[in-house]
Amino acid sequence: GALEAAYAGAVKARTAALNALQAQVVALPEEARAPLRGKGSSELVRACASMRPGAGSSPETLAKVALRSLARRARMLDEEAKGLEAEIDALTKALAPSTRSLLGAGPHVAARLLLAAGANVSRLRSEASFSMLCGASPVPVSSGRADRHRLSRAGDRRANSALYTMAITRMAHDERTRSYVARRMSEGKTKKDAIRCLKRYIAREAYRALAQDMEALGMS
């Protein structure tokens, strides 16, 4: 939990520094802005971090000081985030190998699932209770149609977020998942409904993997 929080904080601060850097560049006079125009974030950070403002207190000099400071801060935070991500990657591989083996379960997804499971060990006693924990249990909707459901909004937001990330990743990179979603939509379901079905399927996979990992850790 602490590593994920630290990573999220570093990413948020990095984004803020990059946004501030972009804003400073936009505010530059045209002549000073021209060499920086069209650069991507990485190129912009590299260019601004290596600026040499020189002495003096002219507006251009002070602007370059600010740009260099923001760029170096963004670079430092990027390195911090990458370091924390590497720690999370190693930790989840060691603690949750079965969960990490699931398609779409990268370090942050596995960490969120592991944290949710660790905080709610009793919910791992059955697939149904875990699905409810993840907010992946279908709830009937009063729409006049017997086949209309929504997912429960109750449950652990970390686990729900992890399942959603896995679903989107699979839809982007896995042909079988794309075929599954297409088939569900051909049956009359909306894309949102199809994703709900997919999340329920993934919840079943995640339950089995987490149960194995938690048992290996002596937490089941």
Please name every model-derived segment.
Residues A17-L18, A81-K82, A119-S122, T169-T177, ...:
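Short helix-capping/linker segments at secondary-structure and domain boundaries
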Residues E4, L67, L113, A162-A167, ...:
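Short alpha-helical scaffolding segments that buttress acidic/His motifs in well-ordered protein cores
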Residues A2-S98:
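Glycine-rich, often acidic, oxyanion-interacting loops/wings at catalytic, nucleic-acid
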Residues L21-Q24, A34-G40, S142-A146, E175-A182, ...:
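Short coil/turn segments at secondary-structure boundaries
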Residues M185-S220:
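Basic, amphipathic alpha-helical segments enriched in Lys/Arg and hydrophobic/aromatic residues
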Residues S101, P107-E187, K191, S220:
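Phosphate-backbone recognition surface of nucleic-acid-processing proteins
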